[in-house]
Amino acid sequence: MGKDFRYYFQHPWSRMIVAYLVIFFNFLIFAEDPVSHSQTEANVIVVGNCFSFVTNKYPRGVGWRILKVLLWLLAILIGLIAGKFLFHQRLFGQLLRLKMFREDHGSWMTMFFSTILFLFIFSHIYNTILLMDGNMGAYLITDYMGIRNESFMKLAAVGTWMGDFVTAWMVTDMMLQDKPYPDWGKSARAFWKKGNVRIILFWTVLFTLTSVVVLVITTDWISWDKLNRGFLPSDEVSRAFLASFILVFDLLIVMQDWEFPHFMGDVDVNLPGLHTPHMQFKIPFFQKIFKEEYRIHITGKWFNYGIIFLVLILDLNMWKNQIFYKPHEYGQYIGPGQKIYTVKDSESLKDLNRTKLSWEWRSNHTNPQTNKTYVEGDMFLHSRFIGASLDVKCLAFVPSLIAFVWFGFFIWFFGRFLKNEQGMENQDKTYTRMKRKSPSEHSKDMGITRENTQVSVEDPLNDPALVCIRSDFNEIVYKSSHLTSENLSLHLKESTSEVEAEQEPAASQRMRTN
């Protein structure tokens, strides 16, 4: 590999730095974000509707409860079916011809996002039914989730930690197992491949660090504002840019993959903490219902990048919070030095009265329950709010917008099958041109096996880039750089299996005749 831009962009050090910086940035923005301390109800666009639709705001009547459950169950079912057959197969596979979605690749991630979409749609259908009744306005589904912002942000922080850690670990695991950069980390690779080192390290580090992370986040054991003592305090503009760069880094992790944007390589990425690059779950076979036996198959690469796109949802919500942040909407106000204070008493948060949510009012009025000023009972944050205009804050989305454009550009121009390649989605990346005889033409060749098959390898059409493998069964042309003993073995195995499949019915027919 020549030492060009791609060499350095996809270098192991570059990939590992980006993967681990995302973890640090996510913790930093969680600590600096004033929303993380807000006592008001959390609201998340679309996701909040889905969460509220499934988990809370159930009417008292049994009939209404049954209706609601049936609607969100129907939404999940339709979402799974539409995600698999409409979005994955039709839209991504046939219409857009995206290589990364060939066969069943990426189907579970597509089905997940499709399910969210249909839960959102059915929540509005449910709202329409409630409005028709006239007396059910209190049970309307909105993007408010029924939990406090503080609790939701803690859950989001733990979720992003898990997702970012698994992603960073898989990047590290890949760097230490594969060999596109053979001169990098020789001693580390030798240690990594010894026995079960990578397996033991993963589970040990995961349980240890996750226990510490959950303990610190959920118990407020460590206070960031007491720890940093106001060192380089952030404002809404700097936090918006930080959230934007987190989105950029999420996309960079995917774009730095050696097989981006097609993901059609022959490198199997082992799942973290396991010896296998994929997991299979057998669905119970009911012959009366299903005509075939179905299995759930999850590959390491889609397991990794599927998690990234889930984390991307939380990061987008974090970016939204910074861009449209207004202190009074989150039960907060601005004190001296443009510092943010968080109101903790529930009485002041009932109506979010802007008069009571101010430094002037809370510093001059006494709480009768504590005989102290309201300010003394509020939480002081070193984070600042300078009142920047929306235009200035929206500039923070420019880096993310550029990253999304480049991401789409590479997929559109380099990650799609050509029109004349339609129908080749199921072929291996080494496929160039294939001509097969019908198996019926070989039904007379009884007893032909792999051992007595004659195979010749020649140069087709005087093109040194191609190698032709011709056997008694068929002819296949490979790119010479991809020709391996495994390809040759697979080619012969596929050829003989087709003949054997046709021989078996013929043999059975002769037995019945005799």
Swiss-Prot record:
InterPro entries, A to Z: TMEM117 (IPR029370)
Stretches in topological domain Extracellular: 37-65, 132-154, 220-239, 317-394
Region forming the signal peptide: none
PTM sites of type Phosphothreonine: 453
Residue spans of biased composition, Basic and acidic residues class: 438-448
Keyword field: Cell membrane, Glycoprotein, Membrane, Phosphoprotein, Transmembrane, Transmembrane helix
Cellular-component GO terms for this entry: endoplasmic reticulum; plasma membrane
Keyword flag Magnesium: no
UniProt membrane topology term: Multi-pass membrane protein
Transmembrane segments: 16-36, 66-86, 111-131, 155-175, 199-219, 240-260, 296-316, 395-415
Glycosylation, residue list: 353, 371
A biological-process GO annotation: intrinsic apoptotic signaling pathway in response to endoplasmic reticulum stress
Subcellular location: Cell membrane
Segments on the Cytoplasmic face: 1-15, 87-110, 176-198, 261-295, 416-514
A Pfam short name: TMEM117
Segments for region (Disordered): 430-450, 494-514
Major subcellular site: membrane
Family as reported in the entry's similarity comment: Belongs to the TMEM117 family.
Function: Involved in endoplasmic reticulum (ER) stress-induced cell death pathway.
Identification of the protein by name: Transmembrane protein 117
